[in-house]
Amino acid sequence: MVTVLTIFIASAQTLRIGKGRVELTAYPASGPDATAVIVCPGGSYFWHDKVSEGDSVGHWLQRQGICAFVLRYRTAYVPAFITHFRLIFRGNRYPDPQNDLREALRYVRAHATEYRVSPEKIGVMGFSAGGHLVMSSVELFPREEWPAFIVPVYPVVTMVEPWVHKRSRRGLLGDSRTGNRQLRDSLSLEKHIPDGCPPVFLVNCEDDPIVDFHNSVVLDSALTARKVPHVYLRYATGGHGFGANCRKGSAECRTWRRHFLTWLRSLNL
């Protein structure tokens, strides 16, 4: 596999991995044996929020001594949103984003020495549809390829009524498969929490106007039932899409970053 490296900004590097428009932007940490986090921005599996849920997150993690990798995974893209061409043509759809995350995990592990990170300390963090993507890693990937920890922030979780985010379902499944009940069920994450699931740090807000907050409620219940070590921060206010942007959300929801860092240290990876 050929990897193309270009300079993105002074403190980051963008690498093209896998197929299509898949890119990984690295924000290297300064110390040795660092923790690494692969960040998956949201966007309903149609596009990416590369600012609040991508670059802002990468810079924030880097400042904390964490090596961040922001993943531009394959999405359906805007033409698929405004038309229904995927009724005829395949386009980008499941399992493309999942395959891209799997490839990113493999890449970071293979280049752990280069980035001065520990292969045993590579976690994943995702926002909205990206939260669904990172949580699906332990349900769809072989156990030996699991991340060390998972951070879904205001995630899409279920693909079935009544709490489904329909735009994300359409983006992931494609127009020709949105009615496939078996596929919907298999990608409803609350139904398939595996034994030995890595620790999870879950965040959402009750006033989320985009992804119904019950998505996180059912995930929390499933994690509890499977005795998965996890933290669930459920804020009253904050809405959706705040990521690591200090100008978005509410004062209370923006504390999630501080709580995450405390939790991460408690894992003693």
Label each PLM-derived region with a short phrase.
Residues 102-166, 184:
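Primarily recognizes the serine-hydrolase "nucleophile elbow" in alpha/beta-hydrolase
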Residues 196, 202-204, 208:
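Short beta-strand/loop motif that positions the catalytic acidic residue
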Residues 79-86, 217-269:
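C-terminal catalytic histidine-bearing segment of alpha/beta-hydrolase fold enzymes
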Residues 34-42:
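Short beta-strand element of the alpha/beta-hydrolase
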Residues 16, 155-192:
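Mobile cap/lid helix-loop segments that gate and shape the active-site cleft of serine hydrolases
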Residues 159, 207-211:
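Acidic catalytic loop of the alpha/beta-hydrolase fold
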